[in-house]
């Protein structure tokens, strides 16, 4: 049985979050946590928080199973675009430039490895 966690309205552009999501897609949870902890990207902090939440959701959904991080893997990670806040920045000659402050929604799905020794 799989479990998922969704982090909504993260104040990071979706393009930057997709770079981090690609690092952990398909990896074991313990490897994914190590990658996110050692990543220098600012978005990796939010991704780590969501990954921990997905693991906790798996434990909540399956109370009779005792699984460790090495028995779970990241089944899917996807990033959707959230709301865009539009702001104005003063520009030369009385004009204004539009600044788009983008946000995203991060979804992480974890599942149990079928054969732990082969994955």
UniProtKB/Swiss-Prot annotation:
Record-level GO BP terms: translation
A GO-annotated cellular component: cytosolic large ribosomal subunit
GO molecular function: rRNA binding; structural constituent of ribosome
UniProt KW keywords: Ribonucleoprotein, Ribosomal protein, RNA-binding, rRNA-binding
Domain of life of the source: Bacteria
Biological role stated in the UniProt entry: This protein binds specifically to 23S rRNA; its binding is stimulated by other ribosomal proteins, e.g. L4, L17, and L20. It is important during the early stages of 50S assembly. It makes multiple contacts with different domains of the 23S rRNA in the assembled 50S subunit and ribosome.
Record-stated family: Belongs to the universal ribosomal protein uL22 family.
Assembly information from the UniProt record: Part of the 50S ribosomal subunit.
Protein name, entry field: Large ribosomal subunit protein uL22
Species for this entry: Chlorobium phaeovibrioides (strain DSM 265 / 1930)
């Amino acid at each position: 049985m799989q479990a998922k966690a969704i982090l909504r309205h993260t104040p990071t552009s979706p393009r930057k979050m997709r770079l981090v999501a690609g690092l952990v897609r398909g990896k074991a949870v313990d490897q994914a946590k190590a990658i996110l902890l050692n990543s220098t990207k600012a978005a990796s902090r939010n991704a780590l928080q969501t990954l921990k939440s997905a693991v906790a959701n798996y434990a909540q959904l399956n109370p009779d199973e005792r699984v460790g991080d090495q028995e779970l893997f990241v089944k899917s990670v996807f990033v959707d675009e959230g709301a865009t806040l539009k702001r104005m920045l003063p520009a030369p000659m009385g004009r204004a430039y539009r600044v788009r402050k983008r946000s995203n929604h991060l979804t992480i799905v974890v599942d149990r490895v079928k054969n732990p020794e082969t994955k």
